[in-house]
């Protein structure tokens, strides 16, 4: 069986669907891995790193023409611009594992089905223990929460931590996080580490303990929340 890894074509996309260490695992399992030249460059994985782990470097056309399973970060539905052009290269019987955004781009999914392609949409994998290793949303949400605070810290015209100097004292920044899912919790933790005073709110009262556990204050409002879920 052949696994193919094409370079991501969506504007601004720097991720790669398979890293060199994972290539080695697949090769040891008896699979052949084809990687488009330059697929991992933007993510910090040069071509020699893939070759050293057993992958073969090929053209984009060869990846789609030869691979039984195509691994992508964004499928044609979730991609933008040039990524949608990949649609014409999928062939009947091929399996595509990626984030496809089937609810946002149902026409793309219908086109894949019409071509006889089997598509697995990773963002729809349920958040259960058995599927934890395939939970792409939680890992990306963690990065998003972290990055959001870094952007805020760079944009805010004051420093995050309290600083005491001979010239006086600078009060810490106050951060308010709305929504305490995976991204929210990471944002809280990052802001706290940078020295800010952090408060957070979520419609789910059950997350109060999680907020307190990362050192923030949970803000409560007198709202009807009986129907709120207890998971983020």
Language model regions located:
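Glycine/serine-rich phosphate-binding loop and adjoining beta1-alpha1 elements at the start
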Residues: 2, 8, 78-174
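An N-terminal-biased, well-structured beta-alpha scaffold segment characteristic
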Residues: 2-111, 115
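Glycine-rich phosphate/diphosphate-binding loop of Rossmann-like nucleotide-binding domains
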Residues: 6-42, 161-232
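Short, hinge-like loop/turn segments at secondary-structure boundaries
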Residues: 50-54, 136-140, 215-220
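Short hydrophobic/aromatic-enriched beta-strand-loop microsegments
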Residues: 57, 95-98, 118-122, 198-200, ...
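Short, basic, helix/turn surface patches
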Residues: 58-69, 144-155, 224-232
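Short, acidic/turn-prone active-site loops that include or flank metal/cofactor-
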Residues: 63, 101-103, 124-126, 204, ...
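Short, charged, surface-exposed secondary-structure boundary motifs
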Residues: 67-68, 106-108, 129-133, 210-211, ...
């Amino acid at each position: 069986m052949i696994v193919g890894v094409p370079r991501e074509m969506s504007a601004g996309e720097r991720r790669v669907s398979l890293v060199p260490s994972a290539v080695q695992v697949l090769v040891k399992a008896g699979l052949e891995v084809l990687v488009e030249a330059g697929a991992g460059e933007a993510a910090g994985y040069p071509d020699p790193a893939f070759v050293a782990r057993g992958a073969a470097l090929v053209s984009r056309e060869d990846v789609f023409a030869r691979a039984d399973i195509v691994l992508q970060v964004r499928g044609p539905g979730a991609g933008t611009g040039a990524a949608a052009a990949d649609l014409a290269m999928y062939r009947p019987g091929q399996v595509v594992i990626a984030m496809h955004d089937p609810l946002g781009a149902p026409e793309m999914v219908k086109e894949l089905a019409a071509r006889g392609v089997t598509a697995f949409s990773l963002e729809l994998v349920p958040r259960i223990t058995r599927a934890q290793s395939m939970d792409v949303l939680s890992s990306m949400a963690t990065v998003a929460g972290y990055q959001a605070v870094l952007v805020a810290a760079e944009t805010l015209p004051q420093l995050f931590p309290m600083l005491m100097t001979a010239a006086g004292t600078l009060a810490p920044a106050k951060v308010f996080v709305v929504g305490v899912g995976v991204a929210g919790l990471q944002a809280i933790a990052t802001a706290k580490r940078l020295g800010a005073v952090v408060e957070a709110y979520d419609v789910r009262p059950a997350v109060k303990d999680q907020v307190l556990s990362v050192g923030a204050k949970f803000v409560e409002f007198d709202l009807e929340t009986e129907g709120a879920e207890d998971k983020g």
